[in-house]
């Protein structure tokens, strides 16, 4: 009985901690010429200037940054929200990138893998 309660409490604590991190919920990517544009939808419990989603990046699977979109202000009343980044150069032959969101308190959230077509 104690083990089940402890596991439940730990699971809830983990969920609460993760709920504060930004989450990418949708990505659309399009290629034009030699570069890509990404429209990324982020969900985060922005509370104001003290804690908000402050950016997201486009990365290769090895962690190499291809581009970064700074979010200059909180989106307290606009959740989830979508912002775009264009002119991202993706190396030839790469068919997968990872979008990683960031917030001003917890740092990076979980990556969202995108297959490029």
Question: Model-flagged regions — what are they?
Answer:
Residues 14-16:
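N-terminal signal peptide c-region/cleavage motif recognized by signal peptidases
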Residues 52-54, 95-97:
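Short beta-strand/loop motifs in extracellular/secreted proteins, especially
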Residues 55-59, 100:
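Beta-strand signatures of extracellular beta-sandwich domains
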């Amino acid at each position: 009985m104690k083990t089940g309660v402890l596991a439940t409490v730990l699971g809830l604590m983990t969920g609460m901690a993760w709920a504060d991190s930004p989450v990418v919920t949708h990505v659309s990517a399009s290629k034009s010429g030699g570069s890509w544009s990404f429209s990324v939808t982020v969900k985060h419990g922005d509370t104001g200037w003290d804690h908000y989603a402050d950016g997201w990046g486009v990365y290769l699977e090895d962690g190499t940054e291809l581009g970064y979109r700074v979010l200059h202000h909180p989106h307290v009343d606009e959740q989830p929200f979508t912002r775009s980044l264009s002119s991202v150069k993706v190396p030839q032959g790469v068919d997968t990138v990872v979008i990683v969101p960031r917030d001003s308190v917890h740092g990076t959230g979980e990556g969202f893998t995108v297959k490029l077509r």
